[in-house]
Each structure stands twice: as structure tokens, then as C-alpha cells.
């Protein structure tokens, strides 16, 4: 079986960066590190770090898990992120 390399992912757009900014803000308010967040949602620290640095985008499932772990409202996070780029 031949495994084809995946195509490079596009850089996160404005909205994806706004979402990660909201997540970083919530983490800072709660004094939660990237390593702690990774453990809370069952992802690797590297996976979370790349997304917090806007090198990749969080998925919708990631956002749902992160909001649940941080006690944040997912809809509010999305609305706040959207308003920050308009």
C-alpha cells in the first residue's frame, strides 16, 4: 500500500485566527497552558501549539471540545471572533 503525502494545508484565514485569539484569551484568563489544554481535550501539545500559533486551524470539533473544557459557550466564541474581524 502506497501512502500519498497530504497536500500542504492553507494558512489559517482571518476568522480562524480570530477563533484562536478567543481561545488564547480564555486560556489566559483561566491561566491554562497549551499543555494543560491539550491534556484536557485529548490532543498532543504539538497539535494545540501549532493552532495557538496560527500555523494551522482548529477544527469545529476542536472548538467544541475546547469550549467544553474551558467552560466557554461555543456560539459566543464564534460570534465574538466574527465581530472582531468586521
Regions found by a protein language model. Name each.
Residues 24, 35, 64:
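Residues within the helices of the helix-turn-helix
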Residues 28, 42, 53, 82:
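Residue-level detection of the helix-turn-helix DNA-binding "recognition helix"
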Residues 5-6, 60, 71-86:
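Short C-terminal boundary/hinge segments that cap the last helix of small helical domains
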Residues 1-31:
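A short, Lys/Arg-rich alpha-helix, primarily the initiator
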Residues 31-50:
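Short alpha-helical DNA-recognition segment
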Residues 55-68:
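Short, basic-rich loop-to-helix N-cap that marks the start of a DNA-contacting helix
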Residues 27, 38, 67:
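The alpha-helix within a helix-turn-helix
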